Amino acid sequence: MPIVSLPKIKHVRAFTVRGGGADYHDQGEGHWIDDHIATPMSRYPDYRQSRQSFGINVLGTLVVEIEAEDGTVGFAVTTGGEPAAYIVEKHLARFLEGRAPTDYEKIWDQMYFSTQYYGRKGLVVNAISGVDLALWDLLGKLRQEPVYHLLGGAVRDELQFYATGARPDKAKEFGFIGGKMPLHHGPAEGVEGLKKNIAELADMRSKVGDDFWLMWDCWMALDVDYATRLAIAAHDFGLKWIEEAISPDDYWGYQQLKRNVPKGMLVTTGEHEATRWGFRMLMEMDCCDIIQPDVGWCGGVTELLKISALADAHGKMVVPHGSSVYSYHFVITRHNSPFAEFLMMHPGPTEVVPMFHPQLLGEPVPDNGRMKVSALDKPGFGVDLNPDIAMHRPYTH
């Protein structure tokens, strides 16, 4: 039987979108995700009450479209906005147009190493991730298969989720296996702030009972000493893990924190780490128990496959940060990814709504904290761009 050749890539386009969606933090007033949450900027009183006050939402969403010669379009969304759109249009597009969509390994390699002198992590790798995800979406659509088929197929019949949001008690009602809360007070608020954190944890434990997971997302806000004291105090209330407690660049601090926390408590991080080389540092230095790459920020699916294999060899679980369908299609195929995160993007959060609403159509959500693999059985990542959202193409090439 002759091999069927897929159409080559004809066009790459990059757009920006404002408002809630792939930029998790670009939300309106009164949203739990922007309510006095501890951050590295909390040391400055002017930037303590709101994360938007220091510009957490300045980038907005990046939309990457990749069109094949037959008119099939793959797309993806991530955080990056106009600066990332410039990188996609002016630099990365040259490595895709005229190429076969099956050449994703070579394409990734060329995107990464051509930008290494000004990239390596952060915004540039966000842009690379968006392109890579759009490429996988295109490949799935051309082959009329869901992405998880292309990654080796499902290793279980369903996904199970924990929920991130300010109301773990509601997460329990919705059937999630656990609830991860934002930490509201950082070191600059002293002992009183630490006491408020513990009081909040104690109150939530009384609401959810002893058998429901409770975790803290510290969003890089702490130092090793404060994180250690917080973990020890939280142990009495059954905190399952302490997440991203310190700067993602402080591998030595994470190594120390992992030694310091009470026995049985997990240390997790990786949301703001990127590429196999960054995660290699976390694993070889034994910085954490669970790594949490965001597939839209760490290098895309192509790189996450390498990160996951490295983690498997080191006996570490991979539980990706957020990422909606881009994470779901990956987690369902990995033995060392036993559950997934669901970001509760309702402002309350008192309802289960699609993570990237309103930017995507057809985005599945957990039912009673679970999702059947059949919910992913559509070509590519199985979602469409909402035609009603305002997209802007700031650059061309």
Swiss-Prot record:
Q: Name one GO biological process term.
A: amino acid catabolic process
Pathway field of the UniProt record reads: Carbohydrate degradation; L-rhamnose degradation
- Can you say what this protein is called? L-rhamnonate dehydratase
- Active site: residue positions: 321
> Which sites bind Mg(2+)?
217, 243, 271
**Any other noteworthy remark?**
Reaction proceeds via a syn dehydration.
Q: Which InterPro entries match?
A: Enolase-like_C_sf, Enolase-like_N, Enolase_C-like, L-Rhamnon_dehydrat, Mandel_Rmase/mucon_lact_enz_CS, Mandelate_racemase_C, Mandelate_racemase_N_dom, RHMD-like
**Similarity comment: family membership:** Belongs to the mandelate racemase/muconate lactonizing enzyme family. RhamD subfamily.
